């Protein structure tokens, strides 16, 4: 990434921030560095998701270091997000374990709903596609690589023209997605205008939306786009296979740009699997909705979430464990665990309620200051700081 040409000022600022942070961090933890929304999009280009996507295997990799350290530990302490991400990744992120204690278990349902659902950002889709299609992107770099390194015998099957054809096929998909998002934004204007609550710019994709007269044409538009995407994926897979064969044969050298093709294939495939489900094959146990940009730029986010996560937690998290213990201060309603049992898929568990040793009447003081500025006042933070310091 840092070696790419044509980096913007924003890219360079992010790289400088990253370099300063890398000199101080020992863990590589995302929570240690403060990122803006724009930075977060760039972070996705450099972060590790499995430890297997590090281009330089001999370099320090925080992910692999953490995994080695975890494998040598007898007790692991992780947050709900990592615990569930591990279950989604078939246990590849954490060492194998048989005993699990979940503290603050009343938060598990909301995190499971988020992780077992899906979220697709329009900005992220086009940022990724533009990165692949850029004049300094992987297709352009690979075309130069093939021209300079591939022998004459190989150029009949692996030529710059083959690379360019794959890039053009992906560019056609990008253009189709632009038109598709515009159609979706136009389509949901009617249900958006009928919403009783105007405080939200989100619209659920339900039967009311699917029964709109324009929905059939909208589905056909996605079907046509899917054909173009399938064609592009076939070409890019073929190109990727030829490049990997050439690398194995020693005809060309391996570069991160070739690895990028594999990532591109997976991203485009996953995107169209989600779009197909949302538009053409919705599941009855899943809720789908879209969010519009407040500045009037149309639909910016597509999301889905399971209606309930108890079965998914049982299948993905609990079933292979010998013991699961859940603790929390608010697991009961009127002293009963029934509601939480149902929501967390914990029907057969033993239970115990321990009274809190904390003496609220003696140890808690509720103070309402009368001389504070309103919470939306520019002076509020300074006044709050003065009170805390005092």
Map each language-model feature to its residues.
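Charged, amphipathic alpha-helical oligomerization/scaffolding segments
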Residues: 72, 100, 131, 165, ...
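Long, low-complexity or tandemly repetitive, helically biased scaffold regions used
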Residues: 162, 193-217, 230, 234-251
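A substrate-engagement module of RecA-like helicase motors
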Residues: 1-74, 132-134, 141-156, 160-168
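Short hydrophobic beta-strand that contains or immediately precedes a catalytic carboxylate
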Residues: 101-102, 108, 323-327
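Conserved phosphoryl-transfer catalytic core
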Residues: 2, 106, 110-202
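A contiguous, basic/glycine-rich beta-loop/short-helix subdomain that forms a polymer-engagement track
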Residues: 40-76, 80, 84-91, 229-372, ...
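Conserved Walker B
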Residues: 73, 80-81, 104-108, 112
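Short, conserved "post-DEAD/DEAH" coupling segment immediately C-terminal to helicase motif II
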Residues: 89-95, 113-126, 311-319
């Amino acid at each position: 990434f840092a070696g790419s040409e044509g980096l913007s000022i924003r890219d360079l600022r992010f790289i400088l921030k990253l370099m300063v942070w890398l000199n101080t961090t020992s863990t590589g933890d995302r929570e240690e560095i403060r990122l803006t929304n724009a930075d977060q999009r760039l972070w996705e280009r450099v972060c590790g998701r499995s430890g297997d996507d590090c281009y330089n295997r001999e370099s320090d990799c925080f992910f692999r270091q953490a995994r080695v350290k975890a494998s040598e530990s007898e007790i692991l302490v992780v947050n709900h997000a990592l615990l569930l991400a591990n279950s989604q990744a078939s246990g590849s992120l954490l060492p194998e374990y048989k005993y699990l204690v979940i503290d603050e278990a009343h938060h598990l349902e909301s995190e499971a709903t988020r992780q077992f659902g899906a979220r697709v950002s329009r900005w992220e889709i086009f940022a990724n596609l533009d990165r692949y299609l850029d004049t300094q992107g992987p297709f352009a770099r690979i075309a130069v690589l093939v021209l300079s390194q591939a022998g004459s015998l190989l150029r009949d099957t692996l030529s710059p023209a083959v690379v360019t054809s794959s890039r053009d096929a992906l560019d056609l998909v990008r253009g189709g997605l632009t038109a598709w998002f515009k159609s979706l934004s136009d389509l949901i204007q009617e249900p958006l205008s009928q919403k009783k609550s105007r405080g939200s710019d989100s619209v659920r994709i339900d039967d009311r939306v699917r029964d709109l007269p324009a929905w059939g044409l909208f589905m056909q538009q996605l079907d046509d786009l899917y054909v173009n995407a399938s064609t592009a994926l076939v070409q890019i897979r073929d190109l990727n296979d030829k490049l990997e064969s050439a690398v194995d044969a020693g005809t060309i050298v391996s570069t991160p740009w070739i690895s990028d093709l594999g990532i591109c294939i997976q991203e485009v495939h996953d995107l169209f699997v989600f779009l197909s489900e949302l538009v053409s094959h919705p599941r009855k146990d899943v809720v789908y909705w879209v969010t519009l940009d407040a500045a009037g730029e149309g639909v910016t986010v597509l999301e889905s979430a399971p209606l309930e996560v108890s079965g998914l937690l049982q299948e993905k998290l609990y079933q292979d464990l010998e013991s699961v213990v859940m603790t929390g201060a608010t697991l009961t309603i009127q002293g009963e665990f029934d509601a939480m049992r149902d929501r967390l898929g914990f029907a057969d568990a033993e239970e115990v309620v321990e009274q809190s040793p904390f003496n609220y009447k003696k140890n808690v003081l509720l103070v309402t200051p009368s001389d504070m500025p309103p919470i939306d006042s520019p002076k509020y933070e300074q006044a709050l700081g003065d009170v805390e310091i005092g």
